[in-house]
A protein has these predicted regions:
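Helix-loop junctions and terminal segments of transmembrane helices
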Residues: 66-83, 263-288, 294-298, 351-356
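Hydrophobic alpha-helical transmembrane segments
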Residues: 127, 156-204, 368-373, 387-409, ...
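N-terminal membrane topogenesis motif
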Residues: 1-32, 91, 213-226, 466-483
Length: 483
């Protein structure tokens, strides 16, 4: 049997092998992080765990401001647009990222007392944060180029080594440190510095370009208007934890952070599918063959819905495994955030058209509306209904976010292509079915018998549709072609 599997694997097309390994790699990376969660929730108090997650939330915000998220958006698009000159393009953007990080580091050092007070962080934490902005950019530039070229072996090795080292080093530092929050954060920074620095020199050596006026201008003109979009995305995903810490307490922020982290397990499906589909979708748009996209997109949405329903169904057991009883309330926060993951994937499908046609102003408008609504709802409802309501405000905002991007996508497609890529009725059917089943499982949390009866019914339906589900998985693997 093993020989048969090995032979089948050897005869798979390169694009299928690459897609398979990208998915396995994403799973493994996230799995290690998840496996480490119950260790950190037990060697750190709920308050310390909350403080670390607030610190990490600040990192995601600072990353946007400092690096402009150059390794996303413009970079993926640029690898396709400048396919004849990828190495110089990659090296030039690495150089631009260095300049941006150094500039902001000097700005911080010149007024560090002011910035420390603004973020309520120490100098050590701030410098580690700036270092991680650079190291994460280095890795994402290198990894993006590997994915587009379907060169998966080196990417898998680097990703897995760093993924294993992060929790190992983190546990060792936290156990022996008095300041466990800073120790946990420094562990991440140290591993990334050692693991990713060499990748910077690899791309610089291959591209032999630090400064390119054309590439730098293209990247800045594309991504600066997107900064509000990226910041708004971070506000949608991180502001709730910061607001809970400030409006309630860090212990509540820790409980909410656990629910958010567990719900975000399924974001790896979003990432894996998006990384697999993005070059293919961009190529279809370029070839004006958008009719080919719909079937694959519907199947992808069904797959994302299924995996998130699995998380919602078993949330009580998952929370009890990953944290002590002090975190029990996190169970009730998991479902709305897991449902949000579905809408994150949906809006990404719609936004591909906005990115391709460089309609960054529309992307910015949708993102800012979602972020402002999220902050306003949290500010209004958390004092009234408690911090748990932040999960539902997140869901409401992502639903609105996806709807606005859908409307903008249709507007662009009518103008540029003269046709619409998706059928509104099919999208609505998939979405409403997903929400209905998700809330049924949530209602079953009051009764173990009822919940497992629902799980049994769902399992029977899933088994009867197993051929369809396998067809979806195979189709996701086969859409990739070398670009």
């Amino acid at each position: 049997m093993l020989v048969s599997i090995r032979n089948k694997y050897r005869h798979l097309p390169k694009q299928v092998k690459a897609s398979l390994w990208f998915l396995v790699c994403a799973f493994f990376e996230k799995s290690i992080s998840i496996i480490a969660t119950p260790i950190f929730t037990r060697i750190m108090s709920a308050s310390e765990y909350g403080q670390f997650n607030v610190l990490y939330s600040w990192l995601t915000i600072v990353t946007i401001i400092v690096s402009l998220n150059l390794c996303y958006g413009v970079y993926t698009q640029g690898l396709i647009k400048f396919s004849h000159d990828r190495r110089r393009y990659s090296a030039a953007l690495q150089g631009l990222a260095v300049v941006l990080v150094l500039t902001w580091t000097l700005i911080y050092l010149g007024f560090r007392d002011f910035w420390n007070n603004v973020f309520s962080l120490t100098t050590t934490q701030m410098l580690a944060m700036l270092l991680m902005v650079w190291t994460s950019s280095v890795f994402n530039f290198w990894a993006g180029e590997r994915r587009v070229a379907l060169q998966y072996k080196s990417l898998v090795v680097v990703t897995l080594l760093v993924a294993i080292a992060k929790p190992v080093v983190g546990v060792l530092l936290v156990v022996y440190a008095n300041d466990k929050v800073t120790a946990r954060f420094l562990g991440l920074a140290l591993v990334e510095l050692v693991g990713y620095t060499g990748l910077f020199f690899v791309q610089m050596y291959r591209g032999k370009t630090f400064f390119s006026r054309y590439f730098w201008r293209h990247a800045l003109m594309f991504n600066i208007p997107l900064a509000p979009h990226y910041l708004s995305q971070i506000v949608l995903s991180s502001a709730d934890r910061i607001m809970i810490a400030n409006m309630v307490n860090t212990k509540s922020a820790g409980i909410y952070s656990l629910a958010y982290s567990l719900s975000q397990i399924m974001i790896l499906f979003n990432v894996a599918l998006s990384q697999t589909l993005s070059p293919w979708i961009y190529q279809k748009i370029k070839d004006r063959r958008v009719a080919d996209i719909a079937g694959v997109a519907y199947d992808a949405l069904v797959l994302i819905a299924v995996v998130n329903l699995l998380l919602i169904a078993f949330a009580p057991e998952i929370v009890s495994i990953f944290a002590p009883r002090a975190y029990a309330k996190a169970t009730w926060i998991v479902p709305p955030i897991a449902m949000s993951v579905f809408f994150i994937f949906a809006f990404d499908l719609f936004a591909k058209f906005e990115f391709y046609y460089e309609r960054t102003s529309l992307i910015m408008i949708a993102s800012v509306i979602g972020a402002v609504l999220n902050v306003a709802l949290n500010y209004w409802l958390i004092p009234i209904l408690g911090y748990e309501v932040a999960g539902y405000t997140t869901l409401i905002c992502y639903v609105m976010y996806a709807v606005v991007h859908y409307w903008f996508m249709n507007r662009i497609c009518r103008e540029k292509l003269g046709t619409l890529p998706y059928d509104r009725k099919i999208l609505g059917l998939i979405t409403l079915t997903f929400l209905a089943v998700g809330f049924l499982f949530l209602g079953g949390y009051h009764s173990v018998v009822l919940r497992y009866l629902l799980i049994l019914i769902t399992a029977v339906v899933g088994f009867s549709k197993r051929d369809y589900l396998m067809t979806i998985v195979n189709q996701m693997l086969r859409v990739r072609k070398p670009i």
